Structures are given as C-alpha cells and as structure tokens.
C-alpha cells in the first residue's frame, strides 16, 4: 500500500479528514502496532539520511590532484629511475609538504549535513492503539497522530487537526521572529511556507497552547529534509583566490611543460647528453614552479584567521579569509542578525498623545519621551500620565509570560510579544510580583484566533477586566476612551485607526488595550463580558529592533562599496521598515519583493530582481539559495549571513557563508565559512577589513616570489640555448624556492593594513592574479635576477675555475639582493626611501620582518659553510672576501626596487 509523502500532496490545501482517510488512520485510536511495523518497513526511521563523506585517506590523496604537483611527481620519479635518489626524495618531500598543508585546510563539509540530524532528534507524544505513548521522534511513521504542548519540538511534518491557542516558533525555518498562531482551516494551494497555519514543521518549537496533528512527512520528505537534500546538491564553490590560483596553475603548467620540452630538445639537438639535458629540463621546471607559494598562502591566511578571531570572527575555511576582502554583496537574514531577535515596545499611543520608549530587548531599563512634533524636541517624562500607566499596567496584568534575569541578559519565558509588554511596563516601574499581590488574578480568557484578544479579571480597588488584543477586535467593543487628564470621552475610532496605520508603516506590530469595571461579586468572566462597555486605554507598537552597531556596520559596508541586501521570511512591511531604519534601503526606495513574486519569475527576471532590490520578504529556503546563485551569475562575490536551519543551503552555496556563533543553529554553523562569536553584524565589517589586508599581503608575497622563479628560469633556458654550464641546479632551486622564499616571505603576512583600505571599492572578481602592473614588476625584477645570477656565475667560474663555488656565490648574491627587494616590497605603494627614513612604521612593527631576514641569512651561511650541506646541495664554502663580493648586488637592487614600486604601486 502506498502512502502519500510531502512531495506527493500539498497538505495545507487538503482537508484533514481526507488525509486521515488516505492514511488509514483512526483519529481516536491512532495506528495499530501492525500498521506501524508495515510503515517502518516501507519508509524506514524518521531520521535524515545522508550521502557518506569522503574518507580521510581519499581527501589526502586528492591533495596531489594539482597541475603543478604533477610536474614535481613526474620529475622526482624520473630522477629516481635514473638513480638520483637524493634529488628524487627532496622533490617528493616538497610535494608531500604541499599535500599535508592542503589536507589541513580541507573543510569539514559533511559536518553541516550531519548536524541536521541533531536539529530534529527529540521525543514525541503519539497515539497508538488508543493509548498516548512517549517515543523517540525517530520511531514516528506517516499516519501517526501526534500531540503537541508548550515547550515541545515538532518531531515531523504535521497536518494539524485540532489546536487550542497553539503558537509555534518557526524562526529557524522561516526567519519570522514572532511565533505563528496555528489553525486547522483549509488554505489556498499557493500559500507560502511561512503562512501555512494548518501545518507544523519538523524542527520548529511550540511556545504556547496545545495541538494535535497527523504525520504527513518524515525523514528526508520533511521540509527539514528538503533542506538537507538541497545542501547535498551544493558544490563547494571556489573562492576568488582559489579560482585565480587554479587558472594561474594551469597556465603555468602549460608554459613549464612547453619550456622544459623545448629546453630538452634544443640541448639534445646541439649535442648535449640526454642525462644532462634532462637535468636542465627538470631544473627549469622546478625553477618555474613557486613551490613555496602554497605554504606562504596558508600562513598568510592563518595569520588573517588569528586577527579576525580577535575581532570576534572565527574562520572555519581558510580561503574565506581572502574572499571576504573581495565581497561585493552581503545578503543578510533579518531576525537575530541585523536585529536583536527580541521584540521591543518602541511606541505607545495613550490619551491622545504619542510616546517613544527607549531601551532594547527585554531589559527593564528605559525611558518614556513624549513626542511633541517634527519641529520640536521630544520631552523626557519625569512622571507618567495616569492613562499611560494604565495602558502599560494592562500589558503586564493581561500576560502569561515572565521575564528572567540570566547573567547580564534578560530573557522571556513564554511569548516574545508578551515579553515586550512586560519590559515596557517594567520601565514604568511596575513589577509582576508586586501587581500579583496588589491586583490578584481571579480568572482569564486565553487568546483565541476566533476572538483575537486575551482578558483577565483582577481584584484590587474593585474588580476590573483587563483586555489586550488586535486593534480590530477591541475597537468594536470599546464605547469610550480615557484622555491624558483622566477624562472619559466617546471613542474616536477614526483617529485611533490613523495612528495604527502610522505605526504599522514604521514596521511596528500594534496591540490595543482596554479595561472594564465590573461588580464586586464577579468571580469569573466569559466572552459575553467583553462584548461591550470596554474603555479604550491605548496602543503599544513593538518591533524586533535593529542592532545599533549593525546600522553603523551597514554604512561602513556602503563606504567600502559593498551592497547589503536583506533576505528574510518576515512580512514585507516589517522588512522594508527595518531596511530603511538601517540604511539598507533609502527613503523612497520601494523596490522589494515577496517570495510569491519571485516564484513566478524566470531565471533572467530573478537575476535582475536580485540585482535591483535590497529587500526580499516571505522568502522560502530554496529561494534564498536561488537569490545567492542569481547574484553570483551577475558576477558578484556573495557573503551570506544567517542563523537558522533555513539559511544553511544558501550559506553553503555563498562565496562566504557567515553564521551566528551564539544564537545560530548548529546546522548554520557547520554550513558556514565564518562564525561571528558575538552575533554582531558589525564584526563583518571588521572581517572584511582583515580580508582586504590579507589579499594586500598575499599580493606582496606573489610580487616577491615570482621574480625569483622568473630569474631562475631565464638563467637555465638561456644557458641551454647557449650551450653553457647550468648556473643553478634543480636541488639548489628547491632550496631557494622552498626554504629561503618561505623564510623571507612569511613576514609579509604580518604587514599592517594600508591607509584607506576600507574606502576602496571591492576588487573586480574577474581581475587576474597577475595584473599587467604586477607582470611588469615581475619581468623587471626577473630580468635583474637573471643578469645577477648569470653574471655572478660566469665571473666566479672564470675567476676561480670552480663550478660549485660559482653556483654558490650566484645563489648568495641573489639572496643578498632579495633582502633589499623584500624591504621595498614590504611597503608596497610607498617609496623605499620612506622605510629608510622611518616614515613607514616603527621598528617594533618591523621586528618580524627583520627576524625573517636574520633567519634567512643564518640559513644561507649554513647552506655554503656546513659540510653536509655542501654534499647535499653541491655547494662550496666561501671566505670573507667572497662573501663581500656577494653583498655588492644589494646596491643596484635599490634603484630597481624603486622603479618596480613605481611600475606597480
């Protein structure tokens, strides 16, 4: 027997009775043990199923799947075949070091999917064979009758059959901060996920009331499961840096293979021995490969990680460090990211006057200001008017939630909206405990969707009914209203509705408050007591407010040329209001789209909408992913922030996924490239700054490393063409490219940021790794290095008639010149003279640079003076006069370095 799954039917569009009939479920008895066993066999357990990740050994082997490493592996193998085992082991060692570095960098991508299982594991109350049982959520099957109560996590996707004041927090799925009040009525087929009131989805939480539903989807068929499947389909995107390195590597591979083959063919054709020509070809290949570059890149990124950690941004995947610096768009979830995720009363209308309330979140600290008009400053109130006090008092009395002081923070136990009312009353000096003794509650009418209000009966100075609810439900029941001076007049519904409209346009959720005095013998209340005779007390407008520091961060992003787009599951009016408050959307910028509009768009139209608008509301998880992809197709480097399960696929797809470390779900964290430990959007701006600094320093490293490779390659190629002895051997090249280069280049990773780095526009994502200016620099310095190596080698060889000494002095002269070039490159964009005169930075900040130079010098001394190094690298010891000669190239390097800085500032 086949049973429907989530993908088979739109359950919100079908009557509950029809679904029960299709599932052969008796709503009074539930499933039988036999039926449960059959469905276990057909559907399996209610747990998410995932593709297994790559094993560790395979991830390690894949590190060798790089074009440049192919050359080294082949060269080492041929060397071994020819009997040059020392050379072979050194070359293989270089490839192994690079593979280990890459393996360490490998992200734990499978962790994101595995954490989804944790997000939905819970217990459930289920009706089977007429008995209510408490079972693990994994044991649920389609057709089970499940009961929900306050505090429960929804264990599977349910079509609701009965509800009693049921409210569900679906923020992890939809981004909606306010719990959703559930119902059982049929809904239109096109109803978006966030508005399916007759459904309860796996992974959401019950905040209030009770309900009963039938399981219509389990495991991967749930909405949560659909998210996991979409994540499995996501390919881990390359960051701009890794894309550029891949392109650079392939280009370099073709050039190296061509030149090596050309070198071998020309040398052999001129009568050279195949063995010698192979040594020349290997030396050329090894010299052209910047072996130290992967290690330098890793160290530079790791230093960026450390700097970001100090600024509350934890990097999970190293390439994301640099990618942040090239971000052109930040797509942010609203709830809990740009906003506090704590409902806060910000405006009150009472007695015909308007008041603003300061303070954020659930903290009882704040002040009341009377709004005097556009051209007059607001007035801070010393004492509150009676009608304002009465309005606030009603919000606290007519309330089933509580505020708790947890360390430095305040939290609500219960409904967030009621928490906001408690906080606003506490700011006026009211205490829940105090009011409970002064005005004890005698009876209450809980909030119901049919009536849209809650009422409580209290004793005290007479018996009074206090009511809170929607404006529509209370206005029709009110006959009079209190003015500021305590005078009671006939209610002016038109004026109140105008004020409600004004507050709604600010993105505020508005509740109305009223009271009614009853006879002393009144011990209980019913809906009949609320029908007429209410006295209108006022309105309270609340919102999940923007974080103040996030507002500043949005402006900083704009200054840096980065667009900020809000993608949320919230209402469009609320999203637009928040966007305007934060500066995401300018005044008068009305371009905003809802999920239902996006669903009707084709790919081209969607891409244009993603480009033009900065506010997207009522967006489903799949649409968040589509928006990120659309922006990427437009050429943007996209950073996506989020904290809910609904954000996970988009976080994984984005060039940089940014999750909240405190308030975020485990799924979002595991899907991300970066975590914000303080859940502060402002930390993104700091991370972007560090990302730009990382790229700046990587560029310096490339500008320093490649001219050496260029000089070495030119030296070997020209020597073969002219049938001369090789001035430098393959093992000596590896020493220069790995040991010396890494020692001297790593200090560049510690360079401070350039002034005004956050006032620059984002880099063009299509800009190549080697720009024209950088290429000119590389060619100039490569030419100098070739002249230096070749000239020193020829002079020493003719003077001393010693090949080993000639090669040793050529290398030492090159390293001496590199010291000057390093000093110039370390202040790229400024003159070399600026460093000498101390204008660049203090000696303390340059200490790492000087340490790197000192270590490099010590290693070079050992390279030529230690006997075992002479044997391994075929070098020769030098006397002090020869050392002095090797220092002379430092002098001509000064003007070359200055010219290079002018070519590539």
From Swiss-Prot:
Transmembrane segments: 60-80, 81-101, 248-268, 283-303, 716-736, 774-794, 809-829, 848-868, 880-900
Homology family: Belongs to the cation transport ATPase (P-type) (TC 3.A.3) family. Type IIA subfamily.
Annotated membrane topology: Multi-pass membrane protein
Gene3D superfamilies reported in the protein's UniProt record: Calcium-transporting ATPase, cytoplasmic domain N, Calcium-transporting ATPase, cytoplasmic transduction domain A, Calcium-transporting ATPase, transmembrane domain, HAD superfamily/HAD-like
Pfam families: Cation_ATPase, Cation_ATPase_C, Cation_ATPase_N, E1-E2_ATPase, Hydrolase
Cell location: Cell membrane
EC numbers for this chain: 7.2.2.-
Catalytic activity field: ATP + H2O = ADP + phosphate + H(+)
Lineage, broadest ranks: Bacteria, Bacillati, Cyanobacteriota, Cyanophyceae, Synechococcales
SUPFAM superfamilies noted in UniProt: Calcium ATPase, transduction domain A, Calcium ATPase, transmembrane domain M, HAD-like, Metal cation-transporting ATPase, ATP-binding domain N
Catalytic residue positions: 333
Tagged with keyword Zinc: no
Magnesium among keywords: yes
InterPro entries registered for this protein in UniProt: ATPase_P-typ_cation-transptr_C, ATPase_P-typ_cation-transptr_N, ATPase_P-typ_cyto_dom_N, ATPase_P-typ_P_site, ATPase_P-typ_TM_dom_sf, ATPase_P-typ_transduc_dom_A_sf, Cation_transp_ATPase_P-type, HAD-like_sf
GO molecular function, one term: ATP binding
Recorded GO CC terms: intracellular membrane-bounded organelle; plasma membrane
Keywords carried by this UniProt record: ATP-binding, Cell membrane, Magnesium, Membrane, Nucleotide-binding, Phosphoprotein, Translocase, Transmembrane, Transmembrane helix
Protein function: Could mediate calcium influx.
Protein name: Cation-transporting ATPase pma1
């Amino acid at each position: 027997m086949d049973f429907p799954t989530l993908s088979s039917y739109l359950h919100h569009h079908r009557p509950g009775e029809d679904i029960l009939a299709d599932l052969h479920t008796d709503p009074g008895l539930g499933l039988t043990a036999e039926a449960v066993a059959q469905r276990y066999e057909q559907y399996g357990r209610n747990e998410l199923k995932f593709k297994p990740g790559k094993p560790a050994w395979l991830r390690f082997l894949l590190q060798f799947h790089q074009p440049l490493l192919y050359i080294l592996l082949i060269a080492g193998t041929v060397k071994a075949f020819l009997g040059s085992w020392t050379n072979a082991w050194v070359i293989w060692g270089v490839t192994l070091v690079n593979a280990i570095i890459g393996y360490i960098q490998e992200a734990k991508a499978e962790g994101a999917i595995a954490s989804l299982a944790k997000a939905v594991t819970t217990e459930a109350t289920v009706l089977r064979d007429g008995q209510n049982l408490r079972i693990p959520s994994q044991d649920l099957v389609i057709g089970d009758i499940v009961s929900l109560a306050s505090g429960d996590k929804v264990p599977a996707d349910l079509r609701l059959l009965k509800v009693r004041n049921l409210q569900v927090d679906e923020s992890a799925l939809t981004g909606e901060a306010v719990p959703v009040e559930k119902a059982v009525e049929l809904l239109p087929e096109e109803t978006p996920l966030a508005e399916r009131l007759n459904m309860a989805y796996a992974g959401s939480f019950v905040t209030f009331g009770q309900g009963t539903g039938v399981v219509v989807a389990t495991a991967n068929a749930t909405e949560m499961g659909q998210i996991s499947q979409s994540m499995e389909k996501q390919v881990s995107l390359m960051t701009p840096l890794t894309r550029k390195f891949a392109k650079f590597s392939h280009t370099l591979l073709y050039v190296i293979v061509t030149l090596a083959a050309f070198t071998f063919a020309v040398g052999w054709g001129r009568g050279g021995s195949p063995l010698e020509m192979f040594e020349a070809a290997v030396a050329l290949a090894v010299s052209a490969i910047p072996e130290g570059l992967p290690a330098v890149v890793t160290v530079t990124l790791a230093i960026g990680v450390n700097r970001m950690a100090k600024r509350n941004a934890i990097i999970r995947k190293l390439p994301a460090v640099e990618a942040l610096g090239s971000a052109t768009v930040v797509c942010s979830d609203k709830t809990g990211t740009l906003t506090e995720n704590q409902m806060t009363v910000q405006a009150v209308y009472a007695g015909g006057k308007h008041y603003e309330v300061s303070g954020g979140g659930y903290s009882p600290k704040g002040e009341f200001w009377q709004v005097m008009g556009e051209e007059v400053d607001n007035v801070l109130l010393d004492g509150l008017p009676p009608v304002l006090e009465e309005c606030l008092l009603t919000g606290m009395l007519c309330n089933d939630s509580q505020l708790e002081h947890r360390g430095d923070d305040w939290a609500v136990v219960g409904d967030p909206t009621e928490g906001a009312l408690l906080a606003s009353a506490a700011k006026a000096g009211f205490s829940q405990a105090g009011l409970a003794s002064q005005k004890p509650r005698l009876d209450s009418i809980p909030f119901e969707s049919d009536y849209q209000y809650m009422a409580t009966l209290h004793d005290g100075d007479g018996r009074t009914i206090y009511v809170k609810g929607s404006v529509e439900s209370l206005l029709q029941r009110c006959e009079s209203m209190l003015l500021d001076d305590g005078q009671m007049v006939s209610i002016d519904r038109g004026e109140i509705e105008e004020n409600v409209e004004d507050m709604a346009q600010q993105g505020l959720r508005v509740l109305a408050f009223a009271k009614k005095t009853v006879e002393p013998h009144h011990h209980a209340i019913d809906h009949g007591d609320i029908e007429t005779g209410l006295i209108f007390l006022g309105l309270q407008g609340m919102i999940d407010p923007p974080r103040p520091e996030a507002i500043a961060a949005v402006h900083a992003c704009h200054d840096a040329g980065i667009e900020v787009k809000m993608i949320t599951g919230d209402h469009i009016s609320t999203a637009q209001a928040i966007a305007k408050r934060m500066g995401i959307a300018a005044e008068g910028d009305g371009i905003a789209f809802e999920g239902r509009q996006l669903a009707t768009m084709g790919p081209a139209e969607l891409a244009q909408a993603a480009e033009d608008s900065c506010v997207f509301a009522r967006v489903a998880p799949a649409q968040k992913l589509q928006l990120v992809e659309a922006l990427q197709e437009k050429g943007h480097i996209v950073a996506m922030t989020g904290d809910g399960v609904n954000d996970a696929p988009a976080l994984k797809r984005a060039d940089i996924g940014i999750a909240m470390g405190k308030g975020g779900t485990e799924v979002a964290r595991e899907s991300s490239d970066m975590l914000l430990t303080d859940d502060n959007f402002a930390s993104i701006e700091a991370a972007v700054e560090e990302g730009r600094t990382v790229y700046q320093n990587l560029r310096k490293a490339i500008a320093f490393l490649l001219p050496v490779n260029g000089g070495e390659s030119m030296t070997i190629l020209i020597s073969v063409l002219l049938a001369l002895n090789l001035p430098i051997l393959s093992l000596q090249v590896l020493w220069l490219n790995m040991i010396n280069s890494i020692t001297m280049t790593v200090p560049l990773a510690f360079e401070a940021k350039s002034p005004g780095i956050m006032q620059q526009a984002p880099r063009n994502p299509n800009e190549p790794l080697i720009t024209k200016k950088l290429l000119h620099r590389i060619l100039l310095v490569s030419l100098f290095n070739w002249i230096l190596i070749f000239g020193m080698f020829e002079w020493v060889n003719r003077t001393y008639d010693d090949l080993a000494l000639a090669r040793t002095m050529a290398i030492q002269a090159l390293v001496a010149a590199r010291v000057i070039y390093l000093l110039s490159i370390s202040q790229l964009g400024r003159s070399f003279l600026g460093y000498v005169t101390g204008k660049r930075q203090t000696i303390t900040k340059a200490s790492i640079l000087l340490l790197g130079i000192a270590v490099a010098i010590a290693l070079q001394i050992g390279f030529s003076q230690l006997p075992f190094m002479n044997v391994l690298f075929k070098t020769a010891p030098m006397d002090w006069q020869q050392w002095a000669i090797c220092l002379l190239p430092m002098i001509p390097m000064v003007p070359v370095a200055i010219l290079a800085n002018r070519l590539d500032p």
